[in-house]
Amino acid sequence: MAKEKFVKTKPHVNIGTIGHVDHGKTTLTAAITAVLAEKGYAEKRDYDQIDNAPEERERGITIATSHVEYETDKRHYAHVDCPGHADYVKNMITGAAQMDGAILVVSAADGPMPQTREHILLARQVGVPYIVVFLNKEDMVDDPELLELVEMEVRELLNEYDFPGDDVPVIAGSALKALEEAKEGKLGEWSEKILKLMEAVDEYIPTPERDIDKPFLMPIEDVFSISGRGTVVTGRIERGVVKVGDEIEIVGLRPTQKTTVTGVEMFRKELDQGEAGDNVGVLLRGTKKEEVERGQVLAQPGTITPHTKFEAEIYVLTKEEGGRHTPFFSGYRPQFYVRTTDVTGTITLPEGVEMVMPGDNVKINAELIAPIALEEGTRFAIREGGRTVGAGVVSKIIE
């Protein structure tokens, strides 16, 4: 009997596997699909299919990522897994794969390793809100006290980076053993542990708020003046809904102004409202063409504010990716391309960091020469004369 097609009626959640190299992230991804396939909830994907991830380009950066889909009783999941550590760094910073939560894989035989720490830090910096832990290779640990010790270490590490380490679900198991069971078509004790992990993911990682339910935000791409009607700004609505009659704010580059939406149109047709994902023209009451420009945003009043100083996590492109050939130092002044425009800014490196090499990722402080609508989680590119040399995400607003 053919397995039924995915029905998109269940709530959708994006997750991914993170953790140290060789702790079993890809094996776990394969095991989840294999075990759920036995229940008719997934198409089985072999380790090799997942590990030979196709390369994608996101803002000119080459990232190898595997995407798998599966379901549980409650939800539909899109799951990302990356073959190499550098791919994780790029993925998380560019937001190429937005994660609503992550499964942190830690080998019970080895305990937390350097990349375990680095991935937790990245998750904190780029705003991955929830982590569930899978202690893998449980079959290789004979002493139950050792398992408890590793669990304590992982919980302490999560606490260190402001995750609720004491409340995070920790499930022990063996991805390889579960995979072997599923291959033989019989789900035993190891497969049960995978199902238990997915139950924890179902329960602990909340369903994210949909873009359309968030407060309205639209980056301005273009401004036109239509005689007899006023000023129209165009752009793609990033989130929320805009209706005729709504009061909105124009934020960034200049003092914030309030205005009222007198029309919304798409493909030259009048609409009552535009929503997240729509490319629209928005007619603004009493706003002159000179008063608005590309790089500003339209937003629900009070939901986003202009800033010049922030902390960010950035990835610097390699020479092969078309980036710089040389390092840069504190005081470096590139352009920050935020949504639709470039703004010059100065980068200050953390104490003890002398310089940043192409291929590095680093936490920086930035100060822009003009205020831009920013919030934690805003993504940007770093450019020099129109060429992308880095990518980043705002981790904290300073002023």
From Swiss-Prot:
Keywords for this protein: Cytoplasm, Elongation factor, GTP-binding, Hydrolase, Magnesium, Metal-binding, Nucleotide-binding, Protein biosynthesis
Chain positions recorded as GTP binding sites: 19-26, 81-85, 136-139
Localization annotation: Cytoplasm
Enzyme Commission number(s) of this protein: 3.6.5.3
Region (G1): 19-26
One Pfam family of this chain: GTP_EFTU_D3
InterPro entries noted in UniProt: EF-Tu_GTP-bd, EF-Tu_GTPase, EFTu-like_2, EFTU_2, G_TR_CS, P-loop_NTPase, Small_GTP-bd, T_Tr_GTP-bd_dom
Entry keyword Transferase: no
Binding site for Mg(2+): 26
Catalytic activity, reaction form: GTP + H2O = GDP + phosphate + H(+)
Region span, G3: 81-84
GO MF entries: GTP binding; GTPase activity; translation elongation factor activity
tr-type G domain residues: 10-209
Region of interest: G2: 60-64
Region described as G4: 136-139
EC top class, as a word: hydrolase
Domain of life: Bacteria
GO CC annotations on file: cytosol
Subunit details: Monomer.
Family, per entry: Belongs to the TRAFAC class translation factor GTPase superfamily. Classic translation factor GTPase family. EF-Tu/EF-1A subfamily.
Described purpose of this protein according to its UniProt entry: GTP hydrolase that promotes the GTP-dependent binding of aminoacyl-tRNA to the A-site of ribosomes during protein biosynthesis.
Name the record gives this protein: Elongation factor Tu
